Structure formats: structure tokens, C-alpha cells
């Protein structure tokens, strides 16, 4: 009996232990898991990377979208907000300038483990990451959204119901001769031409104002021939494109600006006039007449002195020279026109003295600001977004502008996709500057109304997916817009308000959003929406 017992007791104990382990495992599986740490942004004015300090070494999920701020050789940084050059938001020393500096310094995370190629400006929803330090994350998961190459290939930015499309575009040293400024090898030059040509054909503008072209006719002649060989047609009426350019007397190895226009849509009145203050061949002006309506406007395309070639007073001199030329040119008996559109690479940020010459001294309107408040950019420098490629108009022209936007095919791209560093032949990163687009619906009977939009605009929810904006539109006068931002300041949607009762689709992702109604770059109504 004892022998029997001694043989079988260990087996019974082992079986009991197995059963208990199974029951213990079942109990563990039934218990709720430790809640995942979610990082939120309750107050954007005070939020910083310090909130992550307790979670170093742990995994967290960011409830607010994170945005790609830099992408250099597949090395990425992300932040809850886009980093801007401070002078894009305010003059040095102003509250806006200082706030931009604070935001830029509040947080920036390098992030490893991202697969595939992503552009600056792409957003990551529900980013799951390991916190390595207050400046370093490791990717564990998330959903990418927005600003992809596919979206940009699908069409141009929304510019409203325009009849004429005007494009200002710095081509980044478009030369036919091989030299240190442009392409250095024949294969690089061929690839540069293909990339530029794809961009110009995709934009398909009625008038191009081109910057950084080789002096003389060789470069522009090749470019225009390729455009016409593409057999493009004008959107809407499908009129065949017939691009022309001007044979100027500029010779040499340096750069110039140039007009390229569709002779089936517009006619130049005479030939371009220019001012050579500070630098030659880089400030031209011409009046165009729309063939369909007979309406006219003056187009000024420019390339001001670079920031590293003298103080801001030199670019201020250039701005004054442009206005002096305009005030003389518009009095010409064959012109008699006040509608002015100034575009080009002015090599200065929005809140600097050269721009103040136009906006403050001559009461012109900064279209980046009018249409996009403080979210506009066309260029990246020092890992910060900004715009030095401007679109500024006279008040007499403003009501005839249906829309304006930079087309972000270049500034958000990794530098590794340039024509001289890759075999990529797409339009992306064909230049270091984004083309800037302006839609025109010329009508000289329209009158600019500088009065602010009345504060009776109302924002309220429709159904679960809709937002209604009431009394923010005035027919025949002021133009107003709405913009939807996340609480972290990421722009989700923005369009013109075109009716007295205007319906807006809310973003699909759940979260907290701030909706603005604004006019003349100033918000007049704001509402927080929880989705």
C-alpha cells in the first residue's frame, strides 16, 4: 500500500500543479491589461516634450497627430506642429515672432524605424512609439495621412473658379550650358529638363513667370518648345496651348526672369519693361490682356538679391524700384491699368522691410496671408518652413483673384531626389522652391471692400459629419474663409465660404478641432468641435 502510494502521489501533485497553473493563466487572461499611456495636448500654449519625461523607456500613443518636419536621407523628425521661420509670422521682437520661436523650441523628436518614403508635412495619426529620450522616439505603429505624392499628382490645389492660371516658379538654375550653378553633366541636364518639364506640363498655366533661367534665349527656347511639343490644352475650353516667350537682349552666363504665355488665351501689350536696380534682368513687368474678355492686368515677375549678398536694404531698394516702375508704366496710354500682381522669389520672409514696402507703404495685399493666414509656405531652410516666393496684389485686383496657393511638389521633398543626386525623373524635387499659383477671373467692375466681416457669423453642428457656417458670406463683396485645425495647430481643411449657409465636412478622425472663420487673414469667429 505504501509502495503504491509512493509511486502515484507525485503524479497527482504534478497534475494538480498543472491544473492550478492553467487556472492561474486563465485568470490572468481575464484580468484587464494595464492601460496604454496616451499622450494628449490639453493646452497648446504650454505643451512641451517634458510631458514625456515620466515615460522614458516606455511605449506611448500620441492622441494628437504628429507631423513630419524634416526628412533628410530617410532620417525623420516629427512634432505636433509644423516648424516655421519666425519672420513668416511676425516682425523680429513681436509677440507673434516670439511665440513662433517658443513653439519651434518646445519639441522635436527624431524617430527611427519608419519604413518607406514620407514627405515633410505628412501626418501620423495615433502614433505608437517607444520614448527613448525627450528628443528621440522609435516607431511602433501609426496611420499616415495627407500631403503624399499621389495626392499632388491627382491635381492642383483648389484655386476656385478661375479663367486664367498664373504661375510664379523658381526653376533653380535652369541652364543649357554645363556649369557650377546648374547641371554639371549632360545626363544631369537631361534629367533636370525632364523633371522641370513634367512640373510645367502638370501645372499647365496660362502665364508662367519663370525665375533662375539662363540669360539669352537658349534655355527658354528649349523649355517653350518642349511645352508646345506636349500638345497641352487649356482646362475648360480645351483650346490648344500655343506658348510664346520674348526675345530679350540679355546675354551672358548669369540668370534672368522671363514670361512664358499662351498666345491663345492672353495677349501682351507691348514688350516687358524692367528695372535694373541692384541686379540686372531680374525685375520685369508686363500688361496682359485676356482675349476672351478684353480685361487686363499687370504682371511683375522678380528675383531679388539673395539674403547672403548684402543687407535687407538692398532688397528694400528693389521693392521700391518695382513700385516706381509700376507707377510709371501704368500711366502709359496703351496700358492705363492699375491691377498689379507681383510674384517671384523676393528672397525675404513675410515680415521684413522689403515686403512692408508693398503691403504697408503701398497698401497691397499679401495673398499668402489673405488666403492661408499663417499656414503658408513654399520653401524650407534650416529645417523650418517659410515662403520667400511671394504673390502680392493691388487692392484693385484682389476681388478678381479666385484663389492662391503654393504647390508643394518641392519644399517637402527629401533633397536626395534632386536631378544630380538620383535617377528620379518625376516632377518632385525638380527645384528647391515650390511653384506659386494664382487663379484669376478678371472683372474690372469688382470693387475691393476693406471693411472687416461682421461678427454675426455663426458656426454650428449639422449632423454628426457636417458643420454649418451661417452669415459669413456677403455676395458681391468681402470674401471669407473657414479653416479647421487640430488643437495642436495642424491644418485639416480650408476653403472659401461661398454662400450664406455653407456646409463643411468634418475631418473623419475623432478628436478635438478648432474651426475659424476669417477675412483678411484675421479670424472673426472660432468654435471648438469634439468629434
For each predicted feature, which ranges?
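Short, positively charged and aromatic/hydrophobic N-terminal segments
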Residues: 3-7, 13
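Sec-dependent N-terminal signal peptides
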Residues: 7-8, 21-31
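C-terminal outer-membrane/trafficking sorting elements
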Residues: 8-10, 452-531
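Extended non-catalytic accessory segments flanking core domains
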Residues: 35-179, 187-194, 275-280, 315-320, ...
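Metal-dependent phosphoester-hydrolase catalytic domains
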Residues: 38-47, 51-55, 62, 119-152, ...
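N-terminal, active-site-proximal structural segment of metallo-dependent hydrolase catalytic domains
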Residues: 135-255, 297, 314-323, 335-339, ...
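Beta-strand-turn-beta hairpins that frame and shape the catalytic cleft
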Residues: 158-166, 264-267, 280-306
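Active-site metal-binding loops of divalent metal-dependent hydrolases
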Residues: 171, 212-213, 302-304, 344-346
Amino acid at each position: 500500500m505504501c509502495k503504491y502510494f509512493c509511486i502515484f502521489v507525485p503524479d497527482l501533485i504534478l497534475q494538480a500543479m498543472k491544473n492550478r497553473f492553467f487556472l492561474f493563466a486563465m485568470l490572468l487572461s481575464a484580468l484587464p491589461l494595464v492601460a496604454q499611456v496616451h499622450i494628449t495636448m490639453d493646452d497648446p500654449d504650454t505643451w512641451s516634450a517634458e510631458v514625456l519625461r515620466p515615460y522614458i523607456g516606455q511605449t506611448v500613443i500620441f492622441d494628437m497627430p504628429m507631423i513630419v518636419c524634416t526628412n533628410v536621407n530617410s532620417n525623420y523628425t516629427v512634432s505636433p506642429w509644423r516648424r516655421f521661420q519666425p519672420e513668416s509670422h511676425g516682425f523680429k521682437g513681436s509677440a507673434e515672432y516670439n511665440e513662433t520661436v517658443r513653439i519651434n523650441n518646445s519639441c522635436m523628436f527624431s524617430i527611427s524605424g519608419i519604413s518607406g518614403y514620407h514627405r515633410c508635412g505628412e501626418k501620423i495619426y495615433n502614433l505608437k512609439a517607444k520614448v527613448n529620450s525627450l528628443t528621440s522616439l522609435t516607431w511602433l505603429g501609426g496611420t499616415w495621412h495627407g500631403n503624399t505624392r499621389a495626392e499632388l499628382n491627382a491635381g492642383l490645389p483648389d484655386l476656385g473658379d478661375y479663367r486664367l492660371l498664373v504661375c510664379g516658379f523658381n526653376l533653380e538654375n535652369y541652364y543649357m550650358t554645363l556649369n557650377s550653378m546648374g547641371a554639371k553633366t549632360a545626363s544631369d541636364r537631361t534629367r533636370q529638363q525632364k523633371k522641370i518639364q513634367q512640373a510645367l506640363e502638370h501645372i499647365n498655366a496660362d502665364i508662367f513667370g519663370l525665375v533662375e533661367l539662363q540669360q539669352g534665349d537658349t534655355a527658354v527656347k528649349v523649355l517653350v518648345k518642349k511645352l508646345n511639343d506636349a500638345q497641352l490644352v487649356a482646362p475648360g475650353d480645351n483650346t490648344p496651348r500655343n506658348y510664346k516667350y520674348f526675345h530679350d537682349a540679355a546675354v551672358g552666363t548669369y540668370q534672368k526672369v522671363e514670361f512664358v504665355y499662351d498666345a491663345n488665351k492672353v495677349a501682351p501689350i507691348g514688350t516687358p519693361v524692367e528695372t535694373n536696380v541692384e541686379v540686372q534682368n531680374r525685375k520685369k513687368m508686363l500688361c496682359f490682356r485676356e482675349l476672351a474678355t478684353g480685361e487686363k492686368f499687370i504682371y511683375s515677375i522678380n528675383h531679388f538679391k539673395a539674403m547672403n549678398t548684402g543687407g535687407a536694404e538692398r532688397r528694400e531698394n528693389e521693392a521700391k524700384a518695382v513700385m516706381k516702375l509700376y507707377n510709371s508704366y501704368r500711366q502709359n496710354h496703351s496700358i492705363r491699368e492699375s491691377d498689379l500682381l507681383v510674384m517671384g522669389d523676393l528672397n525675404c520672409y513675410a515680415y521684413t522691410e522689403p515686403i512692408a514696402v508693398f503691403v504697408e507703404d503701398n497698401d497691397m495685399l499679401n495673398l499668402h496671408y489673405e488666403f492661408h493666414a499663417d499656414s503658408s509656405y513654399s520653401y524650407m531652410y534650416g529645417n523650418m518652413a517659410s515662403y520667400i516666393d511671394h504673390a502680392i496684389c493691388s487692392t484693385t485686383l484682389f476681388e478678381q483673384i479666385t484663389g492662391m496657393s503654393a504647390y508643394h511638389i518641392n519644399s517637402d521633398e527629401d533633397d536626395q531626389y534632386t536631378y544630380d543626386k538620383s535617377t528620379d525623373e518625376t516632377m518632385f524635387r525638380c527645384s528647391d522652391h515650390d511653384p506659386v499659383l494664382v487663379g484669376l477671373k478678371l472683372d474690372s467692375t469688382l470693387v475691393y471692400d476693406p471693411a472687416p466681416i461682421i461678427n454675426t457669423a455663426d458656426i454650428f453642428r449639422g449632423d454628426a459629419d457636417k458643420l454649418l457656417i451661417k452669415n459669413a458670406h456677403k455676395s458681391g463683396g468681402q470674401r471669407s474663409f473657414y479653416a479647421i485645425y487640430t488643437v495642436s495647430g495642424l491644418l485639416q481643411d480650408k476653403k472659401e465660404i461661398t454662400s450664406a449657409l455653407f456646409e463643411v465636412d468634418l475631418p473623419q478622425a475623432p478628436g478635438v478641432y478648432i474651426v475659424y472663420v476669417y477675412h483678411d487673414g484675421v479670424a472673426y469667429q472660432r468654435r471648438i468641435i469634439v468629434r
